[in-house]
A protein has these predicted regions:
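Hydrophobic alpha-helical transmembrane segments of multi-pass small-molecule transporters/permeases
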Residues: 10-17, 42-47, 83-94, 153, ...
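Membrane-embedded translocation segments of transport machinery
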Residues: 2-9, 169-259
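Membrane-interface "cap" regions at the ends of multi-pass membrane proteins
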Residues: 1-25, 51-58, 62, 66-74, ...
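The first (N-terminal) embedded transmembrane alpha-helix
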Residues: 7-26, 147-153, 225-232
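Inter-helical loop and helix-membrane interface segments of multi-pass membrane transporters/permeases
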Residues: 30-33, 68-81, 85, 100-164, ...
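Central hydrophobic cores of alpha-helical transmembrane segments in multi-pass inner-membrane proteins
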Residues: 22, 46-58, 62, 68-69, ...
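Extracellular loop-to-transmembrane helix junctions
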Residues: 31-56, 82
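Hydrophobic core segments of alpha-helical transmembrane domains in multi-pass membrane transport
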Residues: 45-49, 89-95, 101-112, 147-160, ...
Length: 259
């Protein structure tokens, strides 16, 4: 792969690593629940904290050209604990996404009959996760989720077992599918009844909301999580970018545009 293609590929991988629930679900939730002007404190949080930390992580990975544990150990031996904490963060996050992936696997098999068409929420809690009534009934066990979760971890294992090379190949398949599905959801949502009213409610400005402390806390928290920081992801991508790769310009544009 040529230098220009490698540069583009690392850039796309960084975007793919950052795009997630923080961008698709949490940002619209905050914007709707607080104010349509939520993007103002969010952009400030990105400029003040998010983008500088993104550049720092990418630059560290590019300079040391090591995995995140060895990278911090190169600074100080006992700093390796920071790297291990980032690995642990990634494992916790991946454990969450593995469960979500398990739900998707279940719905792939049951989608042909549209068994949830009458009451989607009831079907999910009763048939899929088989939720209990409380902690007193904690002994309930969902066999479909358990089997799907094992399958999800097997998919993750085969996805990453050969390292970065395997991830690149899988990315070339999964990322276009993701973009296509997002476009489909966007077009479908605009075709729903009262879609424009929903867009207005989502973007409705409220100046008073900007003076609430909680909206600023949410903005800075979202700026950190939505860019995929503190998980060792950007350190790794930086180490794959090569010494001649310019960290600043491209990744600032990527960080701002994907949000």
């Amino acid at each position: 792969m040529g230098a220009n293609n490698s540069r583009l590929f690392v850039l796309l991988l960084s975007v793919a690593a950052a795009v997630g629930i923080g961008n698709i679900w949490i940002y619209p939730y905050y914007s709707f629940s607080h104010t349509g002007l939520f993007f103002i404190p969010y952009l400030i949080a990105l400029i003040v904290l998010g983008i500088p930390l993104l550049m720092l992580e990418l630059s560290m990975g590019q300079y040391f050209n090591k995995n995140v544990v060895d990278l911090f150990a190169s600074i100080r031996k006992w700093f390796s604990g920071i790297g291990w904490l980032m690995v642990f963060n990634s494992f916790i996050l991946m454990s969450f996404y593995a469960v979500v992936l398990a739900w998707h696997i279940i719905y792939i098999f049951v989608s042909f009959g549209l068994q949830w068409k009458n009451d989607a929420s009831k079907y999910f809690f009763t048939n899929v996760v088989q939720a209990s009534g409380g902690f007193n009934e904690f002994a309930n066990f969902s066999l479909p989720v358990f089997i799907a979760l094992i399958l999800a971890w097997l998919i993750i294992f085969f996805y990453i077992r050969k390292g970065f090379a395997a991830i690149k190949k899988a990315f070339l398949i999964t990322f276009p599918i993701f973009v296509f599905l997002m476009l489909m959801f966007f077009v479908y949502s605009l075709s729903l009844e009262n879609a424009l009213q929903g867009v207005y409610a989502f973007l409705k400005p409220g100046l008073r909301g900007l003076f609430k402390g909680e909206i600023w806390l949410a903005s800075f928290a979202l700026a950190l999580t939505s860019l995929g920081l503190s998980f060792g992801i950007m350190h790794t991508l930086g180490s794959k970018s090569g010494k001649g790769f310019l960290v600043g310009g491209d990744f600032i544009c990527a960080g701002e545009k994907l949000n």
